[in-house]
């Protein structure tokens, strides 16, 4: 079996939470300003080290707050027992000459005493040396205390490999819905919100809700207009560095995430994950109204509009409304002018390439979409979907007047014309 490179293993297992160090309010109060500056330096360096490995790491709350100069997020004491921490996180602080007066040494000693013991304030934290023994302070001839920094002991300087205990750390928290595993309970809890739809973080400006605090933090920037990360090529700005990194690959053409099944490559891991569901058939997003499942959350969102009847995308020219922005874009091309895409076989023209591609299957006889129940094949996926309702008995389209349900949208439109005709008569 081929050896797995350290980078590959990191991409499969490491999250920022695995190498992050957080404090309670009481622990934070023991830190003097220079120690807090060191904490900021180490946390930002660890985060940047993981990002530099090509991992699609969303910007955590603590990093967002540190960059803004805010007080970093602290551990919730009531939930601290559920948090699984790395077993060998070194909390030795790198000594800087300016912090070694008597008061600072006392403050640092209190912090080290807190972090070195097993207590509810700091569970599972121990001070370790590289060989695994409990760390001790060494005195030089001048009496100065020398210590190792967190980033040095963890081997997380920029460009260095991640330590072995992180690479081999076991995932023991499993999602009961999809089987995906995580290092800790908090990561599992965040993941499970994709199944439950829970969004506990509300924007106080517009009321929009989010499943993750970091997503809310990025959204809040849209109200303030703050976009601190600008592209040097096109000047487009982004709310976080990871989004800028993905965007810059458009200019460089880099596609580091490749599908093992078909070889297709993508700019980011999320696009690869969505693509791989084509091969696996996974459909994790289920409609609570009709039970239909989808491979992408955006497709589920568009589908749910069928049940509500809401069409949020309206044409400015004629007022016609659509369920999806892609449908609106295709429609607006009709107002823009002559169709650009012409069929070489019959001369029929279309406003977009996808419509031309679908049309050309009439000439080629290509029917790639086959029903698994009866084997009947179709040239378009939407026609296969309508056909499968014959087998499932699904009738997702409801008449808003009488409540009668139908298997296709065209049937409900035809049915409603009867009411319109009766109204005219």
UniProtKB/Swiss-Prot annotation:
Residues 14-85 form the KRAB domain. Gene3D superfamilies: 6.10.140.140, Classic Zinc Finger. It holds the Pfam family KRAB. Residues 125-160 are annotated as: Disordered. One of its GO terms (cellular component) is nucleoplasm. The keyword Protease does not apply. InterPro entries: KRAB, KRAB_dom_sf, Znf_C2H2_sf, Znf_C2H2_type. GO terms for biological process: regulation of cytokine production; regulation of immune system process. It is found in: Nucleus. CDD domains: KRAB_A-box. Keywords: DNA-binding, Metal-binding, Nucleus, Repeat, Transcription, Transcription regulation, Zinc, Zinc-finger. Belongs to the krueppel C2H2-type zinc-finger protein family. May be involved in transcriptional regulation. This is Zinc finger protein 2.
